Amino acid sequence: MVEKSEISKAKRVVKRALDLDQNEADTRRGIERVLENVCGLDPLENLSREHAVRGAGETEYVDFTLNIKGEIVMMIEVKRVGLPLALKHLNQLSKYTIDKGCNWALLTNGKQWKLHGISFFAIRTRIVCKRKPSQAYRNS
C-alpha cells in the first residue's frame, strides 16, 4: 500500500521541478524516485535505465524499462517537466515498444502521466495470386 506521505512528497517534487524548470536529466531522476518510492519498484530488479533499442539500423535509448522476472513489460520515456507531452513523443516511444515486443508504454514529464497499451501484429506476407512472371502485370 502506498503511503499518502509518499504521494504528497512526489507532488512536491514535481511542483519544485516545474518551478525550477528542470532539464530532462533532472526530471528523469525525479521520476525514478517516484517509481521507487510511490510505486514500490526495486531499482535493481525492476528498472533498467537507458535501455538500448535498435530501430531502423540506429541504436536509440529508452529512459527506463519495467522488468518483471527478467522480462520487459513496460517502456518508460521521460520528457522535461515543463515540456507538454506530444504525439511525436508517443510515436518515438511506440517505436521502442514495438521493437522490443512490449505492449505497455508510459510517457511522462512528471506532471502528466500517460499509460498506453500498444497493439501490434507480426508482419506477415502471403501470396494472394500466383501467375507466371510474364503474366503478372497483364490485364485479364
Question: Where in the sequence are the language-model features?
Answer:
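Phosphate/diphosphate-binding loops
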Residues: 109
